[in-house]
């Protein structure tokens, strides 16, 4: 049986009430907290017992310190003399436990406890969350603004959806943590004047939800990459994930190694920060070099094509699309699917002849019904110039057509106010919205084929 357990916990740095309760419950189950890090907490196997825990804060401490200062050590010795054993430290946090049934409390002055905790939070907790809040609000606002400007492009792209979701979650958790802390601090500061301790609040439930949402978004993004046929993209993603893990591991290893070597706080901080700047540049250059070498040697196939297009020129006429100039892009999320296909007959395109048959279509598959009208409006006004600055009489506008030949719910065709019809159509089906552009007048038979191929 393992004597160690590592867990990801959801207890805020300042929530000493929640920390003490949690450590007490874990001790009753036979697990004593041994170390705390930004990524996981480590517990050591012990005999199940009732232990009392006390979480205190030492504002002058730093995570770069090689060990406790003389003042800290004196405090630790005093605590040990009264039965409080130090089990671990984390930044300015100190965790003690006591096996006595009714131990003498370490914190007896509410005013000093509140102010000491506040000073400790100003060293790391508050600056970190203010930075995350600024970044989350800035990028989250940009993400939300883009949703209104280009919902199809954003909500159908796993990468954009993942990063946007992460930034919005970052803003939410930062606001919640900071608001919870300052509301508690104001209340605790007033109560302390009357000798009353106020329990710290918990945001654990929200933290769990946020983590699950981010994991789900990341899993969806990764699955989309792995299921694609793009070998080069898979290779780059694999290298970048390894790059991020390596950066965290190496930087943390440097910091911990310097602490074991008893390097001063200033030297440790300087070398660790230098590693944070230098390592990403070195590893990025290494990844680029590896990718280029693998590509040139033929290990990676850069001649990537998506799966077979659902509709080809050869389905509509006697044309060759084996070697044609074809664009076939596709990506999707749980909300939307998006595909763009552009094809010309290679017999003509290779000669550069302007009469080459040309076909281009965009398919938006709406998986979330509440997005349908939104997507339709975007696709409609990408071509329709009704609300543009173009003078009346020179605009391109959509006019409704008979949907029966297309087997659609609604069909619109682009029309010039100068009096001629374009060969661009907007086809609306139950779950799909399709914009298709020909360079010829499609026949009824071709319309039926389009419906059969694109909306089977």
Q: How would you label these PLM feature ranges?
A:
Residues 2-127, 145-154:
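Membrane-protein extramembrane domains
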Residues 120-193, 204-223:
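Core alpha-helical transmembrane segments of integral membrane proteins
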Residues 180-204, 252-268:
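Cytoplasmic membrane-interface regions of multi-pass membrane proteins
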């Amino acid at each position: 049986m393992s004597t160690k357990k590592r867990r990801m916990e959801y207890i805020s740095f300042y929530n000493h009430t929640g920390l003490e309760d949690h450590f007490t419950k874990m001790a009753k189950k036979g697990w004593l907290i041994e170390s705390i890090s930004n990524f996981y907490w480590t517990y050591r196997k012990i005999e199940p017992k009732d232990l009392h825990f006390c979480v205190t804060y030492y504002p002058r401490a730093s995570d770069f310190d090689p060990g406790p200062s003389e003042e800290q050590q004196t405090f630790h010795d005093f605590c040990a003399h009264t039965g409080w054993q130090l089990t671990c430290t984390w930044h300015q946090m100190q965790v003690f436990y006591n096996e006595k049934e009714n131990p003498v409390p370490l914190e007896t002055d509410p005013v000093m406890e509140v102010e000491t905790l506040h000073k400790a939070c100003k060293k790391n907790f508050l600056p970190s969350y203010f930075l995350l809040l600024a970044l989350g609000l800035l990028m989250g606002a940009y993400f939300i603004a883009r949703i209104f400007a280009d919902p199809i492009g954003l909500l159908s792209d796993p990468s954009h959806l993942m990063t946007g979701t992460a930034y919005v979650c970052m803003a939410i958790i930062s606001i919640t943590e900071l608001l919870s802390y300052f509301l508690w601090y104001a209340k605790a500061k007033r109560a302390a004047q009357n000798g009353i301790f106020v329990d710290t609040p918990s945001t654990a439930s929200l933290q769990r939800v946020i983590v699950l949402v981010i994991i789900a978004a990341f899993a969806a993004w990764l699955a989309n990459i792995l299921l694609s046929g793009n070998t080069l993209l898979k290779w780059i993603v694999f290298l970048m994930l390894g790059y991020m893990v390596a950066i965290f591991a190496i930087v943390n290893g440097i910091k911990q190694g310097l602490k074991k070597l008893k390097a001063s706080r200033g030297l440790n901080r300087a070398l660790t920060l230098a590693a944070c700047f230098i390592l990403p540049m070195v590893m990025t250059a290494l990844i680029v070099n590896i990718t280029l070498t693998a590509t040139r040697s033929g290990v990676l196939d850069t001649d990537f094509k998506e799966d077979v297009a659902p509709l080809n020129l050869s389905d509509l006429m006697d044309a060759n699309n084996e070697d044609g100039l074809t664009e076939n892009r596709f990506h999707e999320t749980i909300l939307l699917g998006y595909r763009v296909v552009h094809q010309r007959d290679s017999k003509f395109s290779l000669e550069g002849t302007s009469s080459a048959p040309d076909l281009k279509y965009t398919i938006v598959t709406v998986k979330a019904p509440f997005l349908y009208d939104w997507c339709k409006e975007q696709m409609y006004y990408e071509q329709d110039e009704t609300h543009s600055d173009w003078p009346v009489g020179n605009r391109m506008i959509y006019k409704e057509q008979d949907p029966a030949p297309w087997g659609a719910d609604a069909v619109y065709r682009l029309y010039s106010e100068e009096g001629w019809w374009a060969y661009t159509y907007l086809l609306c089906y139950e779950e799909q919205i399709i914009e298709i552009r020909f360079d010829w007048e499609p026949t009824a038979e071709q319309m039926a084929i389009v419906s059969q191929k694109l909306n089977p």
